[in-house]
Amino acid sequence: MRKFLNLDKKGACRKNKCPFFYCNRMEKFELHILGCGSALPTTRHFPTSQVLNVRDKLYMIDCGEGAQLQFRKSRLKFSRLNHIFISHLHGDHCFGLLGLISTLNLLGRTAELHIYSPVGLEQLLQPMLDFFNHQMTYKVIFHEFETKGSLLIYEDRSITVTTIPLRHRMPCCGFIFAEKPRPSHIVREMIDFYQVPLYELNRIKNGADYVTPDGEVIPNSRLTRPSDLPRRYAYCSDTCYLPHLVSQLKGVDLLFHEATFVNADAPRAKETFHTTAGQAAQLARDAEVKSLLIGHFSARYEDESCLLEEARSVFPHTRLAQETLCVQVGETFFQA
C-alpha cells in the first residue's frame, strides 16, 4: 500500500490537528472568443463566434466568417469539435460554416459533425456542400428546432444545452450550457487509511458509507468531500431587450449578452431588434449572474470603452469580449 499522510481516523493530521481535504482542481469549463463584431466587417473584429471547452470537448457557438482562422489562432484542435450551435440564420452568425466544413473535409475528418440550428439551415447549406464537396470524408448531421419555446436540444455525460427564446428580426435563440452535478470527490488518503477496496469507490462517491471487515461504519462524510457546484454559461445574441429572461438566466455563472449599441442609440437598437450595453447590464444585475461578458459591437464605435463604462455603471462585474480572449466560466470579473 502506498504511503499516506499521518492522519487519525477522523481525518485530522496527528501532527498539527488540521483537517485534511483531498485537493482536486475544477474540471475545465472555459470560453474562447473567436469573434465579437456584428454584421458590418471591420479591421478590429471578426463576426460572432465562440468555442466552449468543457473537459476538452469543444462546442462552437455561432460561426461567422473567418471563424476557422480564429479557431487556429486560439490553438484549439479541430479533432475535438463535434457540435456546432447556431443562434439564427443571419450571415454574420453562420457564413463561416461552409469554409469550416470544407477544411475539415480536406483534413480527412471521419467523425460526424453535428450542427444545431433554427429551421432552415440544412436547406440553405446542403446544396453548397453538395456542389463544393463531392467526396465528403465524414457526415454532417443537422438538428433543427423551433425557437418559440425553451427546448433541451443536446445532452451528454457532462452537460445539457437548452435554448433561450430571443426576439430578433428572424427566428433566433440563445443557449444555456449547464454542467451536470458530479459525484462527491474521494479523499484518497482516507481511502488508503481504511484500506477501502477499489470496488467500493463508486458506491462511496454516490453517497454510501463504508463498513469495514470488523463491522465499523465509516461515514461517507469522512471519505469524501462535496463536488464543486455545477456551472452554467448563457449565450444571448441577437435580441432586443427582454426583461422576462431574468427567470431563465437566474444565477448563471457567466452571461454573454449582445451589447450592439449604447443607450444614446437606443432608438436604433429598438429598430434593429438589438440591445444596448446598459440594458444588457440591467438584465445581468436583475438575474444576479456572477459575471457579464458583452459583445456583438456595432462598427460605429471605434472605441468600445463607452459600452464598457455604460454597462459597468449598472453591473460592475462586466468585461468586453475580445478576439482570442479565454474566460474561465465561474470566475468573477472585477474592475481594473
Predicted regions and their residues:
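Metal-dependent catalytic neighborhoods of phosphoester/phosphodiester hydrolases
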Residues: 96-103, 302-310
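Metal-dependent phosphodiesterase/nuclease catalytic metal-binding core
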Residues: 146-294, 303-314, 330-336
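Conserved beta-strand hairpin/beta-sheet module of binuclear metal-dependent hydrolase folds
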Residues: 26-74, 110-112, 175-177, 225-236, ...
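Active-site neighborhood of phospho(di)ester-bond hydrolases with catalytic His/Asp-centered motifs
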Residues: 61-64, 81-89, 118, 233-239, ...
